[in-house]
């Protein structure tokens, strides 16, 4: 028998958490006041649903978003190409052509990215590393930017590896930037004919030194194709500026509501309330956390009606 589920209440829970997000990009990044406020709100709702609740704190490696997130392709103008004239794609290159990409929709920061400041005029090389496996020449992208495509493997072969592995290769080969192109997931769901980017983390404990100076983002399929066609295979220059501090530890907050059962056997139901961004679907829409909150409310109502459960929830 299924429990009841109030979709309107669930949407209200989700909106309440969204309203607590960062004023710039809507996220509730771990260790920030937005994340702590969200955790406290969830604990309060658990208590209001009749569940004894706690709020735990854990000291973990964290990263903090700054204020600069820029990506742009510049096509040099005629002025910038004159011998002895201004540098191509510099401010003095008056007839240059620029294509700006939008943070949150065209590209999103990946977990534990570092900071990087690459103006287009520096003409830093961008190297297409295909799926980024160990057979690719990562050293060719040293002091440059690697472009890796998120793909499934063919004929039973392994697909693109994890963010952790990719970032370790970037660090080992002294890359300044790493761009993963989403060409595998969330395709045609939110944007017709495109695969929208999403934010994923990595296992920072795998790194002896946190990669503070490597910018790490995921871009949509269309943006990745533009970088490949206009920069890797043509004369375009990429501007890449990412500001993230990944060098500190801080506290994350875990709200927990408990329904004691007749036995010590556990049913664990959870979702993450922290998020770098907040948006539709692929970025993070807070639906998981809101669903858990509504389930907790329904379990509280059932406990009032039926008494304690057999298992501890």
Please report, for each region that a protein language model flagged, where it lies by residue.
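Catalytic-core environment of secreted peptidases
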Residues: 7-35, 41-53, 145-161, 182-185, ...
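A conserved hydrophobic secondary-structure block that centers on an alpha-helix together
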Residues: 128-185, 189
